[in-house]
C-alpha cells in the first residue's frame, strides 16, 4: 500500500509556465446530465473548471444547458441529441468523462456505444456514474483509449462480480486482471483505493469521512479527475488520478472542521486556493491535506 504524501502533491500540482495557454491544460469533453440528473454534469464541470482545465465542453440535455451556463459560463455546451456534433467533439477531445447523471436507458446505452466506438488510443476515457452501470450490464468491448473507472462499492460489485463484503485488496487485484493493462480504478468507499491494472501496489486514502456522504460527491470527484488528467503531464497518469482523488477528500476533511456535512460544490470552490498553496510549496499541516 502506498500513501499519498506532500512530496507527491507537489510533484503533480506545479506552477504554470508564463508562456503557457489554455491549450496546454487539456481539452475536456463531459457527457451526461440527462433528465432528471442534470445537476450531476454541472457539478462535474464546475470541478473541472475550478481545478484549471483549459477547455471544458459539456454534452447534456438541451434543457439543461441554461442551468449549466447560469452556474458556469466558462463551459461550452451542446445537446447530446445532436449526434453529428457529438462525433465532432469526440474527435477533438483529449479527455472524455462519460456518465455523471447519465440515465440507464436506451439513450444512455447508445451514447456509451458511440463513445466507446469513437475513441482512439491517444485519448483518455473516464467512465463514471450511469455509464458504469451500462458497461456492467452489456457486453461492450473496451475502447482502445486509456481507461479510468470510478465506481462506488455497488457499481464495482456490478462490474467485477465481487459482493461489497468481499471487496478486499486481493479480490480487487484479481478482478483487475480482466481489464485492459494500464486501466486505472478509483475504488470508492470508506477507505478509497486507487489501482492501476498491471501493478501489484495501490494508493489508499488516509483522509475523508462520512461528511462526504451526500449527492453529487462522486460527480465532483469525476470532474476533478478529468481536470487533473488534462494537465500536469510532468507526472504519470496514475499519479494525477491519485492526487485528484486525495485532494477531493482532503478538502472535504478540512471543511468538515466547521461543517456537519460538506457540499460537493464547496469542495470545488475551495479547490483553486488549495492548489495555489501546494504549487507554491508552502507546507500545510499534516491533518489537513496529507
Swiss-Prot record:
It comes from the Bacteria. It catalyses: (6S)-NADHX + ADP = AMP + phosphate + NADH + H(+); (6S)-NADPHX + ADP = AMP + phosphate + NADPH + H(+). This is ADP-dependent (S)-NAD(P)H-hydrate dehydratase. AMP binds at residue 218. Its EC number is 4.2.1.136. The keyword Zinc-finger does not apply. Keywords: ATP-binding, Lyase, NAD, NADP, Nucleotide-binding. Residues 5-278 form the YjeF C-terminal domain. The lineage of its organism: Bacteria, Bacillati, Bacillota, Bacilli, Lactobacillales. One of its GO terms (molecular function) is ADP-dependent NAD(P)H-hydrate dehydratase activity.
